[in-house]
Amino acid sequence: MSSLNIKQGSDAHFPDYPLASPSNNEIDLLNLISVLWRAKKTVMAVVFAFACAGLLISFILPQKWTSAAVVTPPEPVQWQELEKSFTKLRVLDLDIKIDRTEAFNLFIKKFQSVSLLEEYLRSSPYVMDQLKEAKIDELDLHRAIVALSEKMKAVDDNASKKKDEPSLYTSWTLSFTAPTSEEAQTVLSGYIDYISTLVVKESLENVRNKLEIKTQFEKEKLAQDRIKTKNQLDANIQRLNYSLDIANAAGIKKPVYSNGQAVKDDPDFSISLGADGIERKLEIEKAVTDVAELNGELRNRQYLVEQLTKAHVNDVNFTPFKYQLSPSLPVKKDGPGKAIIVILSALIGGMVACGGVLLRYAMASRKQDAMMADHLV
């Protein structure tokens, strides 16, 4: 009986406990979809507006077209005319050599020079005409040229390879980005030709300097050798004068070997020729006007100097690189296309429209719940 009383007593207190209220954290997806469907016209209008804005932006955005060229070191067949022009100079014992790899490296070095690029842009009629049409002052012109120079790039195609991975050949990609495809190709091609001309001019100038230095060296050395030979001739003449005096004093008129006499000759002042022979030899020595007449080596040196003086280096047109891809005419602009911009703009517009509709619905629902709560109170 006691247990029955306890159960009845406990059941009597159940109404004192409030019932659990339903959870408000659940999301009714069907209701949200219904809300969006009712506002479909608003959503579509916003999406259309964003798509139109994206299309307009795609036309307003600056166009970027990139022209590219791929170059490698020159091949021997390209330099045949240059090598032929150096044949006569090499015969004259002139060490002349233009290394193809060094010429290519010099081309890349000058291509990456910012000062040379600015110099080219300032001297290029095409670029200056484009900038002058904008009617800008000197400071703005300098800024525009600096901005253009940043769009000229040279990339080593082997730089991305691993160190232990061998490369078959050296290759560089040269590129320039401009507002139009024609401008990109024209500027890149013109700059490559400009740098190539500088490399050719500098290489030939180095050869001319070597020729000038060699010629000057041989001239000065020949002059010194002539002085040495002249001094030796003067010493011989003076020695013959002393020998003549000694021969006259000794009474030796004829060569001693013609008389069958045995005379021990003086190594310093020879009298074996006799006074007559010494006198005749002295006349011959004094009659020499050009010391090179009796010196074959000196005459050969003089001939070399004459040939070096006549030699000259002709202007030979050669290319310090070989095109694997000539400056291309871009057919596709850089960056996203108009279709992608419009699609992304439409997606952003859809998200903004849906978010706005749902936010407005949430605020209206909260306001309605607050009014109902006030009404019940």
Swiss-Prot record:
Residues 63-338 are periplasmic. It is a multi-pass membrane protein. InterPro entries: Bact_polysacc_biosynth/exp, LPS_length_determ_N_term. It is found in: Cell inner membrane. The chain crosses the membrane at residues 42-62, 339-359. GO terms for biological process: ferric-enterobactin import into cell. SUPFAM superfamilies: Bacterial polysaccharide co-polymerase-like (SSF160355). One of its GO terms (cellular component) is plasma membrane. Keywords: Cell inner membrane, Cell membrane, Ion transport, Iron, Iron transport, Membrane, Transmembrane, Transmembrane helix, Transport. This is Ferric enterobactin transport protein FepE. The gene is fepE.
